Amino acid sequence: MRRIERCFQRLDGENRKALIPFVTAGDPVKDVTVPLMHAMVDAGADIIELGVPFSDPMADGPVIQLACERALQHNTSTRDVLAMVKIFRETNTQTPVVLMGYLNPVEVMGYESFAKAAEDAGVDGVLLVDLPPEEALEVRPVMDAHGLDMIFLVAPTTSDTRIKLIGEAGSGYLYYVSLKGVTGSATLNVEEVASRVETIRNLAQLPIGVGFGIKDAESAQAVSRVADGVVVGSALVNQIAENKNTPDAINDAVGGILSAMRKAMDQ
């Protein structure tokens, strides 16, 4: 059984939901990322989504775009990100790590060499935001052969037929984007999310993580009542931005938010 599936199975047995933080690798500097990953696990994270910096992150709002810029100022490459995961794995073999980013850096490395390097580093899944399932036919078998789950996005506007397709094409979990627009936008309508999650459950057999619009313990708790996982990104990346000149403060700032979310989700 793969690490992501095992994680959701364990949480299900404990009647708990997955807390899934997102941070951009190499933001604000490369040395911050691995200690931050450990700090997030200590604060209650179950799965880590690690952003691979890209020069044109079109699905992301200004907060995460700036995070990519900060990481790229230090030339954080895809291989650097894989090296970070490898170091993390030296002392943590349990927490799943998902690389989230865009197709271009994967194509540049080549599907096979990327998948092999990701497997060797201890990566568990890949979420490429600009790769729809219809276009993933070539990539999927390569990732699968190296034990990597392919995670796809479901939007509020996604049709039932397409949700079924995504459920069949993906593995690990589905990422439901709870708001129209870019990351870090607008406020969350939990009733709307609950209704959509129910629809998705009837069409796809994978656990459902919900992201976009989760900013605090209250919204994390509300979403955890209806989804299998809560994805939080911009709220954490904001803290990293605020502490970019004092990197030593980042672990506590991010950990504080996650601890509060974990506590609220477990109540």
Curated annotation (Swiss-Prot):
PROSITE patterns linked to this entry: TRP_SYNTHASE_ALPHA
Signal peptide span: none
Enzymatic reactions: (1S,2R)-1-C-(indol-3-yl)glycerol 3-phosphate + L-serine = D-glyceraldehyde 3-phosphate + L-tryptophan + H2O
PANTHER family attached to this UniProt entry: TRYPTOPHAN SYNTHASE ALPHA CHAIN, CHLOROPLASTIC (PTHR43406:SF1), TRYPTOPHAN SYNTHASE, ALPHA CHAIN (PTHR43406)
Claim: Transmembrane is one of the keywords in the record: no
Quaternary structure and interacting proteins, as annotated: Tetramer of two alpha and two beta chains.
Active site (record annotation): E49, D60
Keywords: Amino-acid biosynthesis, Aromatic amino acid biosynthesis, Lyase, Tryptophan biosynthesis
Keyword Amino-acid biosynthesis: yes
Family under the similarity heading: Belongs to the TrpA family.
Native organism: Alcanivorax borkumensis (strain ATCC 700651 / DSM 11573 / NCIMB 13689 / SK2)
Name of the featured protein: Tryptophan synthase alpha chain
Any one annotated GO CC term: cytosol
InterPro entries: Aldolase_TIM, RibuloseP-bd_barrel, Trp_synthase_alpha_AS, Trp_synthase_suA
